[in-house]
Amino acid sequence: MNSLNIFLKNLDHNFYTIKSKLKNSTKLIGVVKANAYGSDSLIIAKRLESLGIDMIAVAYTSEGIYLKKNKINIPILVFYPQLESLKELYKYRLEPAIYSKLIFKKFNELIEEKSYKKYPIHIKYNTGLNRIGFSSNETTWIVKSLNKSSLALKSVYSHLSMSEEKKPSKISEKQINVFKNIIENY
């Protein structure tokens, strides 16, 4: 039988090490998608919440609902909300990453139908990983649409294709520059 030992004190150490390198105003998100990469999302989320993490992130709405039902009270970002899960996402007050015009429009329609004002969302850009996300040339549409919507922008983010490298690669540098140009429009 295989087993996995999780040393929560090591998680504590890593959290405080990362936090010490950030400005006090910088928000920190703990990613616990895919059952915290196989190490039990509820245990990890509870520990991160007790340490003072600002937000938890999951891949899908069902993962966020599981955490909410198990008393995780900090905001939960859902990276890949699907059209069929938007009502549940709203019901549990999960925060969606909006990565397409269709998701933006459908979620805004739902929020307006509920008469909710300024529901927090996150905008995901594709700066080179080429999975999902808005392209940089859609920024004007996003900004105009946000200004007319019942949605409130909480963050803008992307995903570096080579983020595990110690020194940014040429590809990562290009993605960072694209992202910086996007941010100037907000």
Predicted features along the sequence, with ranges:
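Active-site-proximal beta-alpha core segment in soluble small-molecule metabolic enzymes
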Residues: 2-6, 10, 26-186
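Conserved PLP-enzyme active-site core in the AAT-like
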Residues: 21
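Histidine/acidic residue-rich metal-binding segments in metalloenzymes
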Residues: 15
